[in-house]
Amino acid sequence: MDDMLIVTTNEVAGYRIVEVYGEVFGLTTRSRNLFSSAGQQMKTVVGGEINGYTKLQHDTRETSIGRMKEEAKAKGANAIVAMRFDSSTFQNIDSVAAYGTAVKIEKI
């Protein structure tokens, strides 16, 4: 396995957990572009996807996952189980936390 395996389940089919390193997380907080936000407000009136916010959320989640993976690798893990997201928004600031349990797995 070349890269970090990340799953939302507590186990990985075909593997066994041989060591548990504990909780790991990656946190990203970003502010929205005020000029972009003004244009996106019109979308809330007429309906439809708000592309700017969708991209912001996607990028923020990807960054959070990357930071979580770095923390897990630093602990010696090769997988993360029970991965979840938590997010919050306050005014023009979006925060996303990716978290899970860092483990070492090996093929059965």
UniProtKB/Swiss-Prot annotation:
It comes from the Bacteria. SUPFAM superfamilies: YbjQ-like (SSF117782). It holds the Pfam family YbjQ_1. Belongs to the UPF0145 family. This is UPF0145 protein llmg_1596.
